[in-house]
Amino acid sequence: MEGYLNPINIFSEIGRLKKVLLHRPGEELENLTPFIMKKFLFDDIPYLEVARQEHEVFASTLKNNSVEIEYVEDLVSEVLASSVALKDKFISQFILEAEIKTDSTINILKDYFSNLTIDNMVSKMISGIVSKELKNYVSSLDDLVNSASLFIIDPMPNVLFTRDPFASIGNGITINKMSNKVRHRETIFAEYIFKYHPIYKKNVPIWFNRWEESSLEGGDEFVLSKDILVIGISERTEAESVEKLAISLFKNKTSFNTILAFKIPKNRAYMHLDTVFTQIDYSVFTSFTSDDMYFSIYALTYNSSSSKIHVKEEKARLRDVLSFYLGRKIDIIKCAGGDLIHGAREQWNDGANILAIAPGEVIAYSRNHVTNKLFEENGIKVYRIPSSELSRGRGGPRCMSMPLVREDI
């Protein structure tokens, strides 16, 4: 992007958004059934036609605010179109990571993918493949035992949530180790984009890689300033990963000198930190707390002389911890004002999962009307988007977007 030396430039959660990564909802949502949706981390089945309409409103809202949009499927297709050898390598890796065991099935799939246009191939990899789509396919015992019901290759409906497979931090990224097996293949796309795409293969250091043993997901990664990160320890991100990321950032002499680890309960409703906590203005955050939702906070700093990380538990309240490290008074708007009924309802429907597109300007689901009204009463400009279908995947505007470039603040 013109005006930036690096293709990744993220030093805040709220700087004016210039470039973002999305995924267009596709046929993968049509391959969800009541019998398998829990396995694929969905609580209900979205209606694709309406989900697409809602997502287009989201994309249009971004474009109307001068945000450039990249689509993950387009970037991967551009990479694979550059080299037949690279395309073949990608196909082989994708099939391997789909855990196809028998040579006959592997060869059938290689032929099938190779004969599709690149755009259609990427689309089919995301949407999944059932046996009736392949000529000459005969399932082996091993394929049947390791297959999910009808699928030779499982769908990847969570690609919709581009926030999680990788995260932009400073001028670099983390390519994440996903917590759930059904999401592991999503990070292949990030691997190829940042290894081979002409825009992204240079000047983008990788702080954490997808082959790590412990899990890390983008919904738990927050860049509060050029000095401070917040990382959630949650249902999806492990404490070991926070320390690994801290070591990587500190030893590479980045600008980040403090990582605040926010431990939250391991609970489906609070799968990532960004389901209960986001920044919406310079000094304003939104959060959700309840009897079973609370924050334990730890500060990680680096002693360069001993090359060791120092960990300190913070005993103060969330607001006071943020005020201390950011050096200014902080206000926290509780989801639905802390109302026991509306707060729980709106948190479940991503009332705290807000995407800031500029300081004090956010995109939010229209259904969370109590929280949105509170934002506006506190001077926040809210762009409302419809979400009757998108919200069925338990992800809001922040989950559905990965910022690539923000203006520095």
UniProtKB/Swiss-Prot annotation:
Pathway: Amino-acid degradation; L-arginine degradation via ADI pathway; carbamoyl phosphate from L-arginine: step 1/2
Active site (record annotation): 399
Subcellular locations according to the entry: Cytoplasm
Keyword set, alphabetical order: Arginine metabolism, Cytoplasm, Hydrolase
Gene Ontology MF, one: arginine deiminase activity
Pfam families the record matches: ADI
Leading EC class: hydrolase
Catalytic activity: L-arginine + H2O = L-citrulline + NH4(+)
Gene Ontology process terms (BP): arginine catabolic process to ornithine; arginine deiminase pathway
InterPro entries: Arg_deiminase
GO CC term, one of those recorded: cytoplasm
Known EC number: 3.5.3.6
Family: Belongs to the arginine deiminase family.
Record-given protein name: Arginine deiminase
Source organism of the structure: Borrelia garinii subsp. bavariensis (strain ATCC BAA-2496 / DSM 23469 / PBi)
Gene name, Swiss-Prot/TrEMBL: arcA
